[in-house]
Amino acid sequence: MLKSFRGGVHPDDSKKYTANKPIEIAPIPDKVFIPVRQHIGAPTSPVVQKGDEVKKGQLIAKSDAFVSANIYASTSGKVVDIGDYPHPGFGKCQAIVIEKDGKDEWVEGIPTSRNWKELSVKEMLGIIREAGIVGMGGATFPVHVKLAPPPDKKVDVFILNGAECEPYLTADYRSMLENSDKVVAGVQIIMKILNVEKAFVGIEDNKPKAIEAMKKAFEGTKVQVVGLPTKYPQGAEKMLINVLTGREVPSGGLPADVGAVVQNVGTCIAISDAVERGIPLIQRVTTISGGAIKEPKNILVRIGTTFKDAIDFCGGFKEEPVKIISGGPMMGFAQSNLDIPIMKGSSGILGLTKNDVNDGKESSCIRCGRCLKACPMHLNPSMLSILGQKDLYQEAKEEYNLLDCVECGSCVYTCPAKRKIVQYIRYLKSENRAAGEREKAKAAKAKEKKEKEEVLK
């Protein structure tokens, strides 16, 4: 048995609702609402206009920035609006609304057929960048950036994250069972790009069928499939790297600092589709689950489908949910309405009942220390939450390693005072980012002033 990481928690995995449900293809809704911001990095700008006819797989928004990701039409039809619409992370965001024409026709040239073994690393990275692929476990970092580490970072191991440790979510689990050929191709493509010979597939040991399926799929390769102790957040990058390689990502560091790159199952499938068939990222497997959902399912759904349309495909609600979550219950975000769209990083939609939710009235920290024991990053969550209440982001960053927090929610799960620790930490991070932007603007203004003074001399 592998040694586990320090900290973590053991919530009920609640995967019984959908673990044995094969992936179903969701119908294409009458309209898709495709946000231009679905990734970490520079936002994209529309390259289509209201009234344009578009095909499935056609580029509709792009950015010339390196850290960004193209956006594509998820079906064919007419662009009926470009404006601000509900967004799961930003409240409202510019989105391109496409009314389907019922034909679902591909843009010319897609799909195609390519042998990845005959492509150069540069060609494959270009294809992945063009296809708009991001990390599909929720982080949504552009994959072409992650697969091109700086020359001074010597990567020697790739890790496929098959842990899927968030309760309720089974999209990756079903994908490993049903699309193992694409998973294998995606891993092999990544290994060629990174020029590594060592790779691991890490899967929690509460998924024996997935472990068996992956061992069979990777038989005869240099990829090692490993059953991991079931403990949340086993699927966090830094935890996976530590358990599988013994390496510890330093404070403020990245996986590449210790020679590792991690991607999840859905991302590998998207890479296979793009490199082998030329298909951009226009759909994904998403879990629709929770006690309020009438027929929980794993669905292959088009980007831009609203939560309402996805839930309706699952029979709607059997009772009024007390909470709707985008993602999983530990790291996901509560939503106030069902008009928001499924995006590239939408791993799940949860409709939770009162019995599903461990909510309660928040009170002051009682200094019990449970959150410190649960934190896998060796932080002091209680102090960070207190600093969040006091708006002391600088102190949180410099003295309590704010930016090392992975927002896993283990602290919240263990807190008897029901403190919203992760919310405070997210607030501190947002304030820190805002301060950084203010400093950049101040420096730019000072530089401009100095240049003007030089001209006038």
From Swiss-Prot:
Residues 433-457 are annotated as: Disordered. It is a peripheral membrane protein. Its EC number is 7.1.1.-. Binds 2 [4Fe-4S] clusters per subunit. [4Fe-4S] cluster 1 binds at C365, C368, C371, C415. One of its GO terms (molecular function) is metal ion binding. Keywords: 4Fe-4S, Cell membrane, Electron transport, Iron, Iron-sulfur, Membrane, Metal-binding, NAD, Repeat, Translocase, Transport. Its cofactor is [4Fe-4S] cluster. It is found in: Cell membrane. The keyword Nuclease does not apply. Residues 353-386, 396-427 form the 4Fe-4S ferredoxin-type domain. One of its GO terms (biological process) is electron transport chain. One of its GO terms (cellular component) is plasma membrane. InterPro entries: 4Fe4S_Fe-S-bd, 4Fe4S_Fe_S_CS, Ion_transpt_RnfC/RsxC, Nuo51_FMN-bd, Nuo51_FMN-bd_sf, RnfC_N, Soluble_ligand-bd. It is an enzyme of class 7 (translocase). It comes from the Bacteria. Induction: Up-regulated when grown on H(2)-CO(2). [4Fe-4S] cluster 2 binds at C375, C405, C408, C411. Part of a membrane-bound complex that couples electron transfer with translocation of ions across the membrane. Couples electron transfer from reduced ferredoxin to NAD(+) with translocation of H(+) out of the cell. Essential for energy conservation during autotrophic growth. Contributes to ATP synthesis during heterotrophic growth. The complex is composed of six subunits: RnfA, RnfB, RnfC, RnfD, RnfE and RnfG. Belongs to the 4Fe4S bacterial-type ferredoxin family. RnfC subfamily. This is Proton-translocating ferredoxin:NAD(+) oxidoreductase complex subunit C. It comes from Clostridium ljungdahlii (strain ATCC 55383 / DSM 13528 / PETC). The gene is rnfC.
